[in-house]
Amino acid sequence: MKFTEHEMVFFNSITKGNDVFGIPLKFRTQKSHEEEVKKTINGLIEKGVLASETELTKMGFLPARALECYKESRNHIIINYLHIALLEQREAIVIIPLKNREYEMLRLPRVAVLYLLLKIYPVLQTGTVSEKELLQLQDIDSFLREVKDCKENIMIGEFQDNALTKEWLYYWKNNQIFEYDLNRQIKREVGAV
């Protein structure tokens, strides 16, 4: 389901915890604060999420609980602008920032996240499978020079307990897919999915 930034701030305010990992939500007022709050509440009532100013509907409980699970998760992955919280029940909460400060929030089985990635990045379905894996040390400066003209790069950050544990980038060059581990400064050619 899609929500405005103000609606996400509302859900954040009624769930446990303060911050939504990786997503800087703010209540940005264009008019008076009271008018914006009223507009936000009316929008949630129109979507069937709120029954009144103080009561969630059954349909409203689902996104509120999804955001709460996202906030409680200890394991997060950020792939470009895709924010993923891995849950213990082989599920994931995915929050996708859209245009105009809107967000789409999905609760999916983890395997569906792979399908979503293949749908968003069809280039993952192409490429060659190398017979030998060759690891190559490459300093960050030469890597940045190499990747500056590459398009459709995928940046991945893996987080545990809100701390970055691993960071790497997939990029395409000369019809080949490469992975660069930013922590270890190692480049390798990878095969297609």
Task: Give residue spans per PLM region.
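Short alpha-helical segments that sit at the start of domains
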Residues: 1-16
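Generic hydrophobic/packing signal
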Residues: 39-40, 141
